[in-house]
Design a protein with these regions (language model features):
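DNA-contacting interfaces and partner/effector-binding or oligomerization modules
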Residues: 1-91
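C-terminal regulatory/effector modules of DNA-binding transcriptional regulators
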Residues: 24-29, 35-36, 154, 279-337
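Charged, structured surface patches that assemble and position nucleic-acid processing machinery
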Residues: 90-102
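Short, charged, surface-exposed secondary-structure boundary motifs
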Residues: 103-107
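Short alpha-helical segments that sit at the start of domains
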Residues: 110-140
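Loop-centered beta-sheet repeat module
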Residues: 139-199
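A compositional/biophysical signature of low hydrophobicity enriched in polar/charged and small residues
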Residues: 196, 202-208
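Short gly/ser-rich loop at a beta-strand->alpha-helix junction or flexible surface loop bordering the NTP-binding
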Residues: 206-292
Length: 337
């Protein structure tokens, strides 16, 4: 049995372990008895899971108090989120790739970085955060419009104008990963910051079609010309990245402009603004406004159209340098308020 083997192998490699043996099989896994070289004996209660969702670990923690002895989770694949929950709560873990963590009884086991050949990422887990998943994106954006709001599935589906099935799929995934919870009143986001960080990782794996341009104007002058572009040509634009972020939280100085413009307006906008397309050294990034989710909850700040704090966060997390700094500032000031 792989679960038994991967735990036994790690413990028996330790020089201070005299004996390790499985003493009982249980409905959840097995119990192993361990004897150290000084004669001290203890037991570990090993829970085996084919899929170790963070929510499953939360349930394991509830059972933990009923068992006398140390608690250990074994699964083919253990995500970083699951590992963090285990470590925070003193639960050991082992996966089939050899990654592990166990602390107790003068024992410290820790091994990370072994690549799992078949990481547990279902189609649903990847598609929910991808830029092409427009409906899922709209559902998530509605949830983040007010992270303190509790939703009924029917109300959320009506608000987003999608099926209850689509909403249910998203909420089930969030609950499995312990980012959302269900109460008697409905569903709500319980770990907004962790959820956003995971979303931003997947979001950044696909690059939005971008015009890389150079302008002789400084950012403030160019952003003023964008306002003129709207007035003179009727072309909508939405500031994001540094340009959008400082409108919400002016914590960084910047020399690059980030803006969304519809793909059909790109060439006309570039010509009006007097920009030159370049392969390197760009100080203007024009992102293609491919779908309406990017501009959901956008607002007018001063004379400029600015994407939502959520979109600023997602875009800024992909910017090298001080992008994460502006993203974090917007997160704290506008999203987690």
């Amino acid at each position: 049995m792989p679960a038994m083997e991967c735990v036994a192998k790690k413990f028996l490699k330790l020089p201070n372990i005299q004996k390790y043996e499985v003493s009982a099989l249980t409905e959840y896994g097995f119990v192993a008895a361990i004897e150290m070289d000084d004669g001290f004996e203890f037991k570990i209660h090993v829970y085996t899971m084919q899929k170790s969702y963070p929510s499953s670990v939360m349930q394991l923690l509830e059972k933990r108090g009923k068992d006398k002895g140390d608690c250990v989770l074994v699964s083919p694949y253990i995500s970083k989120r699951t590992a963090d929950i285990c470590e925070k709560n003193g639960v050991g873990y082992f996966d089939y790739a050899g990654n592990c963590w166990f602390v107790g009884h003068s024992i410290y086991l820790s091994e990370r970085g072994n690549k799992n050949l078949s990481p547990e990422r279902s189609i649903a887990s990847t598609s929910i955060f991808e830029q092409s998943a427009v409906i899922s994106s709209l559902i998530l954006r509605e949830l983040f419009a007010d992270i303190n709001k509790v939703w009924r599935l029917k109300h959320l589906s009506e608000t987003v104008k999608c099926s209850i099935g689509q909403v249910s799929k998203v909420m089930d995934f969030l609950i499995k990963n312990a980012w959302a919870e269900k109460s008697a009143e409905g569903y709500y986001i319980s770990e907004p910051e962790l959820l956003l960080k995971e979303w931003s990782k997947t979001y950044g794996k696909k690059t939005v079609p971008t015009y890389l341009c150079y302008s002789l104007d400084n950012p403030s002058v160019l952003e003023g010309k964008l306002s003129d572009l709207k007035r003179d040509m009727g072309i909508d634009y939405y500031l994001t990245g540094f340009s959008g972020g400082v409108r919400y939280a002016p914590v960084v100085r910047y020399n690059k402009v980030h803006v969304y413009i519809a793909p059909e307006d790109m060439l006309e906008a570039v010509a009006y603004l007097g920009l030159k397309e370049v392969d390197s050294g760009a100080n203007v990034m024009i992102f293609s406004l491919e779908n309406d989710s990017y501009k959901k909850d956008s607002r007018i700040i001063g004379e400029d159209m600015v994407v939502s704090p959520l979109q600023v966060y997602l875009d800024s997390m992909q910017i090298k340098g001080r992008g994460e700094e502006i993203a974090e500032a917007v997160l704290l000031k506008e999203i987690l308020k």
